Amino acid sequence: MLHSASVIFLSLSVLAAVGVWGPFVRDGGFDAMDAVVARHPSTGIPGLQHYPEFDRGLMSIVAFNLSAVNSIAYCFMMQFLANVAVIPVILCTEDSSAAPGSWVRYSTIWGLLSQLGTSAVIYPLYAMSFIRQSSREPSQTRQPMSDMALILNMAMGYALPAAITLNVLHSSLNMQIWGILAFTVYPICMKLMARIIKVFTGFRKFPTRSRHQSIPTLRYAVAGGVALQGHLWYLGTELGIFKGHTPSLSAEKMDSEGGARLVLRFLQVDYAITFLAMLLLAWHELIYHRILPAWRALGGLIIGWILVGPGATLAAAWYLRSRFIMAPGKRKKRYGD
């Protein structure tokens, strides 16, 4: 029998998906996105619907089944972590046109810092989880995550985004955008960051890559990170996001206002729905392992989303889950025992 909180949360998730994705599909949002991506001058990407294997990879990761993740799932996570960078570009552009002291200015600054910080915090924790959960050691013998690892990760994760968001160098909009785009190569350092964290947490063993894995993670991240820069810049100019800052933009390309709105809506919805699904499963894990009561876990996830962003909240929930499961001798110290 389902818990009442489960019914409420699941119902809200379904309503959000139907209420927002429905109009998007009805208005031809996917067709508009495919039309833009398919016109890429260098790669000629055929469209988003031609890659169904990424959906299967997403399901593996969202289900926290990292020990059984295949190469497609690793590739999808790299792509997902890199592509969240397009929202900060949009926020930065909108912030530059907002009136000083307005609520729009404050909301975009908060959103930009939250988004960049979310990305910076979640990347190395995903790397750590890849290493830990793909280990062949029994879960009871693995060393739990260190509190210092999370503190250091938060400090490193929010320092550079704060400098970019607050524009401490007083640079132009184009320089800020290039700073954000440069920040998106952070996934390339994902495995290197995991090795740095290893020093602070005392990890001694790293799993060896299986011979049947066809796509090395780091090689894919490097290629994907380089390609992402060109794709983001092309999509930005194609959709008129950088209107007024790209003199070479032709009159024909400027006639894409409807497409820009649809793509922006897609990015917003995709970001919210993806993290909502992942936080829903994180909430389930917290109450399934009886780490927190249902309503306390739900309230903490909601407050965390508002204050520090969904990615950092998900990372914290994942940290609690992993620390409880991996910590030896802590199995009986659950609430209610």
Swiss-Prot record:
Keyword Transmembrane on this protein? yes
Listed EC numbers: 5.4.99.-
Keywords attached to this entry: Glycoprotein, Isomerase, Membrane, Transmembrane, Transmembrane helix
Carbohydrate-modified residues are: N65
The Gene Ontology CC terms held by the record are: membrane
- Superkingdom of this entry's organism? Eukaryota
User: Could you state a single Gene Ontology molecular function term?
Assistant: isomerase activity
| Top-level enzyme category | isomerase
| Topology of this chain in the membrane | Multi-pass membrane protein
Where, per UniProt, does this protein localize? Membrane
Q: In which pathway does it act?
A: Antifungal biosynthesis
| Spans through the membrane | 5-25, 72-92, 111-131, 149-169, 177-197, 222-242, 267-287, 298-318
The family this protein is said to belong to: Belongs to the membrane-bound ascI terpene cyclase family.
Function of the protein: Cyclase; part of the gene cluster that mediates the biosynthesis of the tetrahydropyranyl antifungal agent lanomycin that acts as an inhibitor of CYP51 and blocks the ergosterol biosynthesis.
Protein name (Swiss-Prot/TrEMBL): Terpene cyclase
User: Which species?
Assistant: Pyrenophora dematioidea (Helminthosporium dematioideum)
